[in-house]
Amino acid sequence: LYATKDRKLVACGAIEQKFWSAFCNAIGLADEYANDFRAPAATCDAVAKVIAARTSDEWRPIFAAADCCTTIVVPLEEAMRDPHFVARGLFAHSVESASGKTLPALPLPIAPEFRDKPGTKKAPPPGKN
């Protein structure tokens, strides 16, 4: 995770070389840091400085255009309104806490073909599975 200029976080999951290369190109990382096996700490510091130079709103379209497994971390409330998640029904479930409060919950498994029907289920009391 890397902090942006406006203190939001960028999550980068560029594990495969093609995604790492796309990420380095997208952020304009200096070539000397692209091979993170040489000096991983220096690469991490360089990426942090580059990401910190722009706001999340500046980075969002850059990452959207690049196939680099990178995104801006958003609060739960914003994620619940994301059209992609809404279309997939990821927040169609909820649980009820021991105090009776209804909370949004991700269905498990996430793949819809393996889920029970949407609905509200009571969460077990703390310590009970």
Residue ranges and their predicted role:
Residues R38, E77-E78, S97-A98:
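AMP-binding (ANL) adenylation modules
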Residues V95-N129:
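Flexible, small-/acidic-enriched active-site or ligand-binding loops
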